[in-house]
Amino acid sequence: MSFSFLFLGNLPLAEGFGINTNIFETNIINLAAVVAIVISFVGKNLSALLEDRRKTIVNNLQEASQRAAEAQERLNIAKNQLEVAKKKATEIREEGVFRATQEINNCVAQHEERLSKLEEFKQETVQFYQQKAFKQAYVYIISRIMSRVKERLNKGLDATYHVVVNNFYVSRFTEYNP
């Protein structure tokens, strides 16, 4: 009767030890022996090594998760700072527009005030020169009248002039009602 060993072939019973020339069977037996020796001697070390590797991987994953959470938190902080900066920039822009508008209004008001002062000065200047012109005309007319009076006085008074002056005063007396 034959007994099958791992489907590798038929081994006769009770024949004892001998040289097995089937390379495939011997390789499997050798491999099984090596695996058994490795597992028995290296098994604990290998399982410890695998456990250390598992712990390292778990720690790396936890650290990566923690770093990701920290990065997310820093990102949120940066986003908040960006929003604050945008609000501040908007406020600064609005304040700049407000100040520019205010400055323009101040300049316009100052310009209008200067224009009104210039208009007032112009009116005063025109009035001054009008008064000066009237005064010069008045002085000229008075000087002409005075020169004509002097001429008349120097020439002497003739009879017709006496009659005109006397008639003037007589007419004034007749109009007088006390």
Swiss-Prot record:
Its main location: plastid. It is a single-pass membrane protein. GO terms for molecular function: proton-transporting ATP synthase activity, rotational mechanism. The keyword Iron does not apply. Keywords: ATP synthesis, CF(0), Chloroplast, Hydrogen ion transport, Ion transport, Membrane, Plastid, Thylakoid, Transmembrane, Transmembrane helix, Transport. CDD domains: ATP-synt_Fo_b. It is found in: Plastid, Chloroplast thylakoid membrane. One of its GO terms (cellular component) is proton-transporting ATP synthase complex. InterPro entries: ATP_synth_b/b'su_bac/chlpt (IPR002146). The chain crosses the membrane at residues 23-43. It comes from the Eukaryota. Belongs to the ATPase B chain family. F-type ATPases have 2 components, F(1) - the catalytic core - and F(0) - the membrane proton channel. F(1) has five subunits: alpha(3), beta(3), gamma(1), delta(1), epsilon(1). F(0) has four main subunits: a(1), b(1), b'(1) and c(10-14). The alpha and beta chains form an alternating ring which encloses part of the gamma chain. F(1) is attached to F(0) by a central stalk formed by the gamma and epsilon chains, while a peripheral stalk is formed by the delta, b and b' chains. F(1)F(0) ATP synthase produces ATP from ADP in the presence of a proton or sodium gradient. F-type ATPases consist of two structural domains, F(1) containing the extramembraneous catalytic core and F(0) containing the membrane proton channel, linked together by a central stalk and a peripheral stalk. During catalysis, ATP synthesis in the catalytic domain of F(1) is coupled via a rotary mechanism of the central stalk subunits to proton translocation. Component of the F(0) channel, it forms part of the peripheral stalk, linking F(1) to F(0). In plastids the F-type ATPase is also known as CF(1)CF(0). This is ATP synthase subunit b, chloroplastic. It comes from Tetradesmus obliquus. The gene is atpF.
